[in-house]
Amino acid sequence: RLAQKWSLKNKINLINSLSNHKGALLDIGAGTGNFCETSKQNSWDVYGVEPNEKAREIAAKKNIFLHQSIEDFKGQQFDVVTLWHVLEHLPDLENTIKAIQKLLKPNGVLIVAVPNYNSFDAKHYKRFWAAYDVPRHLWHFSQKSMSKLFSENMKLLKTKPMIFDSFYVSL
């Protein structure tokens, strides 16, 4: 619980350091709404997407009302879009990234956390590394692959390890 609070605080600090003002934030893969709740408490106008109905119900008990799909936000744009350990689960990366780009305001910030298959943990545990998580993790990323994936229409501002973000080392 302490690690989760610390991680949420670090995520808010990261967003605040990359965005020049607190505005509309969309969290894709919002789970039970913990990050949305923390963002709301820190003066962000929060929206979220979570396909899992039970997770949305838990979030609703925290007064965080999540949508089922990013399709619900067609025509809207956000100052910040986050994907915390979501990208590796999505089957159609190219079209998903295009859809996310349309959701960003000009000069908006996209923050993506993914497991790093070049991390110390991955090298140490090799084929037993927890984040390989097949079949749920469809993709595996490194800093280089993430840079290449987003280089076409976006400017990479920063890559950094996210300590305690998950039980494995993340980008």
Report each predicted region and the residues it spans.
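Conserved SAM-binding loop
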Residues: N10-F128, L138-N153
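Conserved catalytic loop of SAM-dependent methyltransferase domains
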Residues: M154-L171
